[in-house]
Amino acid sequence: MTGVQTCALPIFDVTLTSDHRQALEANGLVVPGVGAFGACMEGLKSVGGDTVIKDRLRAGRPVLGVCVGEQIMFERGMEHGTGTPGLGLIKGDVELLDADVVPHMGWDTVEAPEGSVLMKGVEGERFYFVHSFAAMSAAPADTSGDQLDFDDAEERVTWCTYGRSRFVAAYERGPLFATQFHPEKSAEAGSQLLRNWIATF
């Protein structure tokens, strides 16, 4: 929260909440996550967070998932050899990194696409990662069943390579934003990324 607060204040108040009304009405919603995919999904559902996220996206209100908060936006997490359903907002599975040393921990460069909102001005910078799992592919999911209004929005994917894995480092589509890295731990580049996101409000 500290990194988000630093970038948002004094323009915005930052509140840690599981209150539905506050989460729905906020200018932007950050969905953090640490630990296991399954535990994160279980905790999110226990407070109705899955519904809040989809309700916000349905209304075109920005959501930013960070680390496991990014991973749960995908269809499945493949930890422990089993597939745990995610929110299904991005097509793809979250899998164990193929590398000699796991977790991937530390600073790394990324490959940003043209026109990225999040990466504007920080395309050549390094970001801080701490993770063992990641999405190896990304494609727009069919969200028509959830009646989301951004099926025609352009998808922009930022990539990172670690070991033998090329994985999704950041994702943008309409009001949905997500990063596998931690912007709040990524010094000035991370602060600028958060400011870029805040500018979409």
Specify the residue positions occupied by each region the protein language model found.
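Cysteine-nucleophile active-site neighborhood
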Residues: 35-106
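Structural motif
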Residues: 30-32
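An anion/phosphate-binding loop that grips the pyrophosphate of nucleotide cofactors and donors
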Residues: 26
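Structural alpha-helical scaffold elements that stabilize or flank donor/cofactor-binding regions
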Residues: 1, 22-23, 56
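Short, small-residue-biased leader/transition segments that mark boundaries at the very start
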Residues: 2-9
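Amide-donor transfer/coupling interface in amidating biosynthetic enzymes
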Residues: 58, 92-201
